[in-house]
Amino acid sequence: MEIILIKPVRKLGKIGDILKVADGFGRNYLLPQKLAIRATEPNKELIVKQKHEFEAKDKQIREEVEKINALIKDQQLVFIRQTSNDGKLFGSVTNKEIADKLSENISYNISHSNIILDKQIKSTGIYTVEIRLHAELNAIVTVIVARSESEAQDYLREQKTETSEDLAESA
């Protein structure tokens, strides 16, 4: 299937790119998410005319996302959970919970689909989580999962100590 991107898509292309993609990927993801349109002759002509509009709109969205990224950057989210004796959680910390807490902290609604978890958080500790609000921009937040507030503070002190040691080694 041949498509024209109308929004930038990570690892695929930028606005106005004409690409051949698998039929299922185009039909089930790109078209319903309004990331692309079919590459017919009338659509190709339309994109040539409207490419500047799409790019201006994307630039405006990108500027807004950069402001949000500045708020998100260096956030530390603390989750207090019950655990077994070996530090394993009863359940897990989900991307929805991270999105809700982050939205609460910065007063801006973040969707759970913007939270990228490499693997589920199922034990206490410090985790880095990627927040992707735009195809070309992402932010990193620190998620601390602990049994109590005092344990969370210990994790924070430990992280600051490691960071200062890393800075001393690199100097």
Swiss-Prot record:
Transmembrane segments: none annotated. Signal peptide: none annotated. GO terms for molecular function: rRNA binding; structural constituent of ribosome. GO terms for cellular component: ribonucleoprotein complex; ribosome. Keywords: Ribonucleoprotein, Ribosomal protein, RNA-binding, rRNA-binding. InterPro entries: Ribosomal_bL9, Ribosomal_bL9/RNase_H1_N, Ribosomal_bL9_bac/chp, Ribosomal_bL9_C, Ribosomal_bL9_C_sf, Ribosomal_bL9_N, Ribosomal_bL9_N_sf. HAMAP family: Ribosomal_bL9. Binds to the 23S rRNA. Belongs to the bacterial ribosomal protein bL9 family. PANTHER family: 50S RIBOSOMAL PROTEIN L9. This is Large ribosomal subunit protein bL9. It comes from Rickettsia peacockii (strain Rustic). The gene is rplI.
